[in-house]
């Protein structure tokens, strides 16, 4: 079988962290004996410059026909039109592909615990996943309205939308420590009341998974005070956006966190959670670990190469443990240095 992979370098540091990651992919494919076809397309700000829009039709069509999509980063200060921003391309891509589930792991290993702004004894052993609903809620609700005197956003969830994200979370939890935390604001919001009711109904299909409900404000506190207590967290779009960014501070750098976006069928999108960092673009300073770990997620989730994924992850964590890191992690290694070190494993 030949896997069809679409690369979206995007903006800022995106092209440099993705290009090195694709070189690693080539070496990994030879070691693990699989074939793939790779095509690269403009996306985000780069596509605005070349095509006038952040998500050109040819890019979207290629993504629809892919087995997996690897994205570098989008955005930058030079694209100022509020009606034609790079980030709108990402929202449109998620919607077009039905990428309703965003998966963000947060892991603190022996080599990374000292980077955390939180006391090392509190974060050591942290290993949880946030499952965020990605295509509904406040960000997509209608009607919406703004004028000089008032503004309106609409928060809407259907039972079906809650059921499908819950199934993803329960299945992940059943493969891990069998512990699921559902986060809502059930004491105030009608959507959260439906959310909690639906989670409880689906829990009967997974009797081995222990379900705990937390209000979002309590969860935001416990993520910092007791991060090792969590395994899988499931929540709606806005809450997930905030909590996953909060969680990304636990390992000590945005550059350490990968993510994946899933649909029920079709391609999955893999990307680091950090932004495009235009201030350090093209200077060989970017931390590529989040992009590399996103490739590991791709190998595991889209291609079922568990051994290849684990080997790559362990190689990254060993580099960090050995102090072979970029400037943001108090190291002196360049972006290309990191890739060259990892290539030695293949």
Curated annotation (Swiss-Prot):
Top-rank taxon: Bacteria
Cofactor: Mg(2+); Mn(2+)
Reactions catalysed: (2R,3S)-3-isopropylmalate + NAD(+) = 4-methyl-2-oxopentanoate + CO2 + NADH
InterPro entries named in the record: IsoCit/isopropylmalate_DH_CS, IsoPropMal-DH-like_dom, Isopropylmalate_DH
Listed pathway(s): Amino-acid biosynthesis; L-leucine biosynthesis; L-leucine from 3-methyl-2-oxobutanoate: step 3/4
Binding site for substrate: 94, 104, 132, 217
PROSITE patterns (alphabetical): IDH_IMDH
Alphabetized UniProt keyword annotations: Amino-acid biosynthesis, Branched-chain amino acid biosynthesis, Cytoplasm, Leucine biosynthesis, Magnesium, Manganese, Metal-binding, NAD, Oxidoreductase
Keyword Cytoplasm: yes
Localization terms from the record: Cytoplasm
Pfam families attached to this UniProt entry: Iso_dh
Site features described as Important for catalysis, chain residue numbers: 139, 185
Cofactor binding annotation: Binds 1 Mg(2+) or Mn(2+) ion per subunit.
Enzyme Commission number(s): 1.1.1.85
A single GO BP: L-leucine biosynthetic process
Function, as annotated: Catalyzes the oxidation of 3-carboxy-2-hydroxy-4-methylpentanoate (3-isopropylmalate) to 3-carboxy-4-methyl-2-oxopentanoate. The product decarboxylates to 4-methyl-2 oxopentanoate.
The protein's name: 3-isopropylmalate dehydrogenase
Naturally occurring in which organism (per UniProt): Staphylococcus haemolyticus (strain JCSC1435)
Gene this chain is encoded by: leuB
């Amino acid at each position: 079988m030949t896997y069809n992979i679409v690369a979206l370098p995007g903006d800022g540091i995106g092209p440099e962290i993705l290009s090195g990651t694709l070189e690693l992919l080539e070496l990994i494919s030879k070691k693990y004996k699989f074939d793939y076809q790779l095509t690269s397309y403009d996306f985000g700000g780069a596509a605005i410059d070349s095509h006038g829009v952040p998500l050109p039709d040819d890019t979207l069509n290629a993504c629809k026909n892919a087995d997996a999509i690897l994205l570098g980063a989008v955005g930058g200060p030079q694209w100022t039109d509020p009606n034609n921003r790079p980030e709108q391309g990402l929202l449109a891509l998620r919607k077009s592909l039905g990428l309703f589930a965003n998966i963000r792991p947060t892991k603190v290993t022996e080599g990374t615990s000292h980077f955390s702004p939180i006391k090392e004894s509190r974060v050591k052993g942290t290993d949880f996943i946030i499952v965020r609903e990605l295509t509904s809620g406040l960000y997509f609700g209608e009607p919406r309205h703004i004028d000089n005197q008032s503004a309106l956003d609409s928060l809407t969830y259907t039972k079906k939308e809650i059921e499908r994200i819950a199934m993803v979370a329960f299945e992940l939890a059943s493969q891990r420590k069998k512990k699921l935390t559902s986060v809502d604001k059930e004491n105030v919001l009608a959507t959260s009341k439906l959310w909690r009711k639906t989670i409880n109904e689906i829990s009967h299909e997974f009797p081995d998974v222990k379900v705990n409900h937390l209000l979002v404000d309590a969860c935001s506190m416990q993520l910092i005070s007791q991060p090792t207590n969590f395994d899988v967290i499931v929540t709606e779009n806005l809450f997930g956006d905030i909590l996953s960014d909060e969680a990304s501070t636990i390992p000590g750098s945005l550059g350490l966190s990968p993510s994946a976006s899933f649909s029920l069928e079709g391609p999955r999108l893999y990307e680091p959670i950090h932004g495009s960092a235009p201030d350090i673009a093209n200077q060989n300073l970017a931390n590529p670990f989040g992009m590399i770990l996103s490739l590991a997620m791709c190998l595991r989730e889209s291609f079922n190469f568990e051994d290849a994924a684990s080997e790559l992850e362990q190689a990254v964590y060993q580099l960090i443990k050995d102090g072979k890191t970029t400037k943001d992690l108090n190291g002196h290694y360049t972006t290309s240095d990191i890739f060259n070190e990892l290539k030695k494993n293949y």
